[in-house]
Design a protein with these regions (language model features):
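Membrane transport/envelope proteins' first extracytoplasmic loop
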Residues: 2, 6, 11-19, 23-278, ...
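Juxtamembrane segments of multi-pass membrane proteins
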Residues: 449, 454-455, 461-609, 614-617, ...
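Alpha-helical transmembrane segments, especially those used as permease/efflux helices
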Residues: 11-18, 264-267, 363, 367-380, ...
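Membrane-water interface of transmembrane alpha-helices in multipass transporters/channels
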Residues: 355-363, 428-447, 520, 727-731, ...
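Hydrophobic alpha-helical bundles that form the membrane domains of multi-pass transporters
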Residues: 3-8, 12-29, 37, 163, ...
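Small-residue-rich transmembrane alpha-helices
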Residues: 288, 322-352, 364-389, 418-433, ...
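C-terminal transmembrane helical bundles of large multi-pass transporters
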Residues: 496, 500, 567, 677-827, ...
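Alpha-helical transmembrane segments
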Residues: 27-58, 289, 338-347, 423-425, ...
């Protein structure tokens, strides 16, 4: 039977290859994902290892609670006098202090250098070629007072040379510094699109407004002193606001901030690999079902000469195993190219990822191969069991077909039950309280899987009415070819449904994503119109997300025509045992914002004073707060104060710029080291005019890292990140569409084989080659339209269910995009039919009539 299985594969090379493509693409996605994320992980580890390689211990500011690196809060700085104390310890060989922050480089055109949303990293360098310096000098020399070294990527892209001056802006106005050298970060070729700027310590302290302060002290031990001994000795001289870790511990903590991102990215991309394999399973099952139906007499003959049902099953599963192994190996090879493509994809949309070379681990190989082989075998089980039911007498019968299963009558109620259970599981994941993230994702994935399987099975009952409706134009305009095409799609409803289901899944997910994006955009526009109805302009960072120095708003306030500047500061705080993103506003914010108050009014924003706060309704309910209630809030540097509630507001559907607790900016500045604005909003006399815009632009000419935006520009720039994410999702989902495309091609090729005599008879009674091509093309388009219609409808239902759970998105139906998806489904059908239609048209009439 092994020989029979291998001959079966070799005798159907084209059909096997088309079926294998589905597995190749899915395995490539799984392997490429692991290679991408393992490469990123390796790059980050290289970065953190290079940073700490010359150190045995690291001293840093101590926070009262763990803070997020991207939440606007920082650890308290160290006094520079601590460095001398550390150097004086007997166990210390050397120690160097450093400061760091966001340092915006300015191009030759006077505009900020921004690569997508990547940060602009700036830091002091420990005496050039010191053991504590993680940078490698590519060209030039290390910086002295008034110098800067910048990364080679920026030099190459922006055409800078050593000796030229470049603008650098940190906490104050931009400064002109001489480029003394070009550097790279250790062994990493790119650190994710970020720009690097290195300075000597005095220059960095001036730029970051940290005179007399340090962010870190790197310490090296004398020979014979262990890391733990060194840490113990250092701890004795530290103030309460400082902490010390071994270099290995610090590197591990630094890496922990990226581990969450890498885990999320891996899960995110693997989901699309799983989708591609899931769609591929439909292609495999459908292809094998068709080929097994075509081989009915072959299997019957084998049964006649003594083959048992078990041997038939074994033969087919061996075919599936060989195909799965070969396709998975090819997919693994394609995964290398796909991982490079994923790097390029993220780079193209502004999310450049760190890279130190591709990494292929044994785990990635095993998981990718196992996934491909397992999916192939599971998808082959049902067709294989069907083949075992072929009776020996079928060998002598013309046109023998496979007998129906004893359980065929359960197909309809089973599919309805499966779909219903899927919606129950999905609803449970969305609406059940207290679910962990893992439980939520498991229930959501299980629910989606059951829904797709259930609807795919139900589609068999929907094919006839849908083909009648969607095939009407073909029947009316396509003549006999169109009528035959519609009838052919209705002839074997199970086959048509299975083929359409592959496209349905991809389009359902595309529709779901588009629906969510449309809802987010629509809701965000509504929030801006409702909350910031009085603002004429917004001031933000060039990358739209980073905080901006307070000096930017101060400069804008001095521009002619400015009536008010409302600021929003942001960072982390802790109260009632929970850490949250807190905010602060200045009195002018009362003229900018219009909130929906449960208790209080917009005037509260100007009356907060030293101990006032307003809170959102959810926070108030969680902690039983009302007007006058106390909130004891702790800040990252350990300072704390008690605030009294002066107002309670209801956040709009699309979210709010304010955190659970908002206090006055002056009070905020007392409790936070180096505060910054998240946004600033400007009211100008005369509103939006060219003169007012020019006045603001002129006022901010010394702050290139900030930009002036109108209301619509602000909205467009804030949602630009969403557009980038959406583009990534579309590209990744296109993989499942591509799998379904090959599924349609494969089905059409197989049906052409199956209907060879039929096509020969049609040609014999006068059908032209052109009409044959048209018939196959119409059949492909009708099948694609069925998949498209079911997919779009299912995507709308799933999207509506998800939006009903998410309280910050309004349901919005993106009609234009849905029409585009419907047209795309038709296009897929047209393109998929090209090869099978030509193959059918080229059949020799006499040979076709004699075909068995």
């Amino acid at each position: 039977m092994i020989r029979v299985a291998l001959k079966g594969i070799l005798g159907r090379k084209l059909r096997t290859s088309l079926t294998a493509i589905a597995i190749i693409l899915g395995v490539a996605m799984v392997a490429g994902t692991f290679m991408l994320t393992d490469s990123i992980d390796n790059a980050f580890n290289s970065i953190f290892t290079d940073v700490r390689k010359g150190s045995n211990a690291v001293i840093s500011g101590k926070t009262a609670f763990d803070i997020s690196s991207d939440a606007g809060s920082t650890a308290p700085p160290l006094n520079e006098s601590l460095l001398a104390k550390v150097r004086g310890l007997s166990d210390v060989e050397a120690a160097e202090g450093s400061v760091n922050g966001q340092a915006q480089l300015i191009g030759k055109n006077g505009k900020a250098i921004v690569f997508g949303g990547a940060p602009n990293l700036g830091f002091s360098i420990a005496n050039g070629a010191s053991r504590f310096n993680p940078l490698s000098l590519v060209k030039g020399e290390w910086p002295k007072q008034g110098d800067v070294v910048i990364d080679q990527s920026t030099v190459k892209k922006k055409h800078f040379e050593i000796g030229q001056t470049i603008g650098v802006q940190a906490q104050g106005a931009a400064q002109r510094l001489r480029i003394s050298g070009i550097v790279r970060f250790g062994s990493v070729s790119t650190i994710g699109g970020a720009t690097l700027a290195g300075f000597d310590l005095p220059t960095a302290q001036k730029l970051f407004d940290k005179r007399g302060k340090l962010d870190e002290i790197a310490v090296a031990a004398k020979p014979g002193v262990s890391d733990n001994q060194l840490v113990s000795a250092i701890r004795d001289v530290l103030p309460p606001t400082a902490q010390v870790r071994t270099a290995a511990q610090q590197a591990k903590k630094d890496a922990a901030d990226t581990n969450g991102f890498i885990s999320f990215l891996r899960g995110f991309l693997l989901a699309f690999g799983g989708i591609a394999l899931f769609v591929g399973s439909f292609v495999i099952a459908n292809s094998l079902s068709i080929t097994i139906a075509q081989r009915t007499r072959e299997f019957a003959t084998l049964r006649t000469v003594g083959a048992s049902r078990r041997q038939i099953l074994t033969s087919i599963m061996i075919e599936a195993l060989v195909m799965g192994v070969l396709a998975s190996l090819v997919g693994l090879a394609f995964g290398v190219a796909l991982s490079k493509g994923l790097f390029a994809l993220f780079d193209a949309v502004g999310f450049t990822l760190p890279n130190s070379g591709l990494v292929l681990t044994g785990t990635a190989v095993v998981i990718a191969l196992a996934a491909g082989i397992l999916v192939t075998l599971v998808a082959s089980l049902r067709p294989a069991f069907r083949a075992t039911r072929v009776p020996p007498l079928a060998a002598v019968r013309e046109g023998a077909t496979l007998p129906k299963s004893r359980f065929a009558f359960l197909r309809l109620p089973g599919s309805i039950l499966l779909t219903a259970l899927g919606f129950v599981a999905l609803s449970y994941s969305l609406f059940a309280p207290g679910l962990s993230t893992t439980s939520l994702l498991v229930w959501m994935g299980l629910g989606a899987l059951m829904i797709f399987l259930g609807v795919a099975l139900l589609a068999e009952r929907l094919v006839r009415p849908l083909a009648t409706l969607l095939g009407w134009p073909a029947a009316k305009l396509g003549g006999t070819a169109g009528v035959l095409a519609r009838e052919n799609t209705q002839r074997n409803t199970q086959r048509t449904a299975s083929t359409a289901a592959a496209l349905m899944i991809g389009l359902a997910l595309v529709t779901l994503v588009t629906l969510l994006a449309a809802g987010i955009v629509s809701t965000f526009r509504g929030v801006v119109d409702d909350l910031w109805k009085n603002a004429d302009y917004a001031l933000t960072a060039q990358n739209n997300f980073s905080p901006i120095p307070i000096s930017v708003a101060d400069a804008a306030a001095k521009a002619p025509g400015v009536d008010a500047v409302g600021n929003v500061r942001a960072g982390q705080a802790k109260a009632f045992g929970s850490v949250y993103n807190a905010t602060a506003v200045n009195p002018d914010a009362a003229r900018i914002f219009s909130l929906n108050w449960k208790d209080g009014s917009d005037a509260v924003l100007a009356q907060l004073g030293e101990d006032g706060a307003f809170v959102d309704d959810g926070f108030a309910k969680d902690h039983n707060l009302k007007i006058g209630s106390p909130i004891h809030q702790t800040f990252p540097n350990g300072k704390s104060a008690t605030f009294r509630v002066m107002g309670i507001f209801k956040p709009p559907t699309g979210g709010s710029p304010f955190g659970p607790v908002t206090i006055s900016d002056k009070t905020w500045d007392r409790f936070n080291d180096q505060p910054q604005n998240l946004y600033s909003f400007v009211i100008m006399k005369g509103g939006e005019t060219d003169a007012n815009r020019a006045a603001l632009d002129h006022a901010l000419k010394e702050f290139p890292n900030a930009k002036v935006q109108t209301r619509n520009e602000f909205i467009d720039n804030q949602i630009s990140g969403l557009s980038s994410v959406l583009n990534i999702l579309y590209v990744l989902l296109a993989l499942s569409i591509l799998v379904s495309f090959f599924g349609i091609v494969n089905t059409l090729v197989l049906t052409v084989f199956e209907r060879t005599r039929e096509i020969g008879m049609l040609r014999a009674v006068g059908m032209t080659r052109r009409q044959v091509r048209r018939m196959i093309r119409h059949e492909s388009v009708i099948t694609s339209m069925i998949g498209g219609a079911l997919g779009i409808l299912l995507g709308i239902v799933l999207g509506g269910l998800l939006i009903a759970r998410v309280d910050f998105i309004d349901f919005t139906l993106p009609i234009v995009q849905l029409v585009v998806f419907a047209v795309a489904a038709i296009f897929v059908g047209i393109v998929a039919a090209i090869f099978p239609a030509r193959r059918a048209a080229r059949l020799n009439v006499l040979q076709a009539l004699q075909y068995e």
